[in-house]
């Protein structure tokens, strides 16, 4: 086949597009577990940062393990609340946090919003509340940590 013909160029381009698409699809599917684990680790790190916990491990330490250890050490409880402040039985706060946008899409009376309870070395209890709102170009989100009196940030 003549390598300078239009037919050759079209066939070659089509084969290359299909091969690259297959490689990218395989890479995306095979790395999905790691992506989910990294997102979960990032959320845990952000929760810890909101209460002032250092999430940077010592040089050479595994960051994922360090954040998980810190999370287990400081975050003692997670629960969900309704609009009126009542606690939802059996709700997993971390699972709700992963899909917080879908909770905000629901009517206010149907929302179940996560709250996390932390206790530091001195026994000070803090409550961490995820917040989400609209910004100029998209959603803005973060975490607010309140002391036990629910007034002090």
Q: What are the functions of these language-model segments?
A:
Residues 2-153:
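Flexible, solvent-exposed loop/hinge segments and secondary-structure transition points
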